[in-house]
């Protein structure tokens, strides 16, 4: 039985996103697991700007995964957008929704996750409308905000931030830069503190 499950999983691993989504809609839990593993890094990448601004990593990842699961169950290939684009939209829209609720106190565990600078928060505004054409605009705005944040960091911290926002784990970053996971984690915490101070001062979006 275990071998059969392993064989089924291995078979699904080589399936396209579109085929896996069809299997998910048909009730295949293994297909859902495969897609969740395939896109977990995207979820981390979408959530991490908010984590750097003071949010709880586990809460944000959980909400992002809810957005990914919604994408799996609702994706329709005939509508033009790739699954990657649709999934990113759903993940960011979910994060935007819960963070917006947090500002009104409706989601207490995430209250501290809301970026303190309105323009940082609004960088994800159009995702609430699930318009894939707005993805590039939002990426450019977020990139501008993060570029200002990078001015606060050391050369090593800038390197770590780049990999971190790509969704790599601390262990993966450590292997890439030749440092210990502890060193990378310490750098991430320094980055969070520096960004939080600048968000509080209101300087981070002014360049």
Question: Where on the chain are the PLM-derived regions?
Answer:
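Short, aromatic/basic-enriched loop-to-helix "N-cap" motif that marks the start
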Residues: 52-59, 73-90
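Arg/Lys-rich amphipathic alpha helix in sigma70-family domain 2
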Residues: 74, 92-111
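Short, leucine-enriched amphipathic alpha-helices that occur as contiguous helical runs
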Residues: 17, 40, 92, 142, ...
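Short, small-hydrophobic-rich alpha-helical interface motif
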Residues: 24, 39, 43, 60-71, ...
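DNA-binding alpha-helical recognition surfaces that contact promoter or target DNA
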Residues: 45, 85, 89, 162, ...
């Amino acid at each position: 039985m275990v071998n059969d499950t392993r064989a089924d999983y291995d078979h699904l691993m080589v399936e396209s996103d579109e085929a896996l989504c069809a299997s998910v809609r048909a009730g295949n839990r293994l297909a859902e697991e495969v897609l969740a593993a395939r896109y977990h890094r995207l979820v981390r990448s979408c959530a991490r700007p908010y984590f750097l601004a003071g949010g709880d990593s586990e809460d944000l990842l959980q909400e992002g995964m809810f957005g990914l699961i919604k994408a799996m169950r609702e994706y329709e290939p005939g509508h033009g957008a790739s699954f990657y684009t649709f999934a990113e939209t759903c993940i960011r829209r979910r994060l935007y929704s819960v963070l917006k609720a947090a500002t009104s106190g409706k989601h207490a565990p995430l209250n501290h996750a809301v970026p303190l600078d309105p323009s940082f928060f609004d960088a994800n505004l159009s995702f609430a409308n699930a318009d894939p054409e707005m993805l590039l605009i939002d990426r450019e705005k977020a990139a501008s905000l993060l570029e200002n944040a990078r001015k606060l960091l050391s050369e090593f911290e800038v390197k770590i931030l780049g990999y971190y926002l790509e969704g790599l784990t601390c262990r993966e970053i450590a292997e890439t830069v030749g440092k210990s996971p502890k060193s990378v984690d310490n750098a991430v915490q320094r980055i969070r503190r520096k960004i939080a101070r600048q968000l509080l001062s209101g300087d981070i979006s002014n360049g």
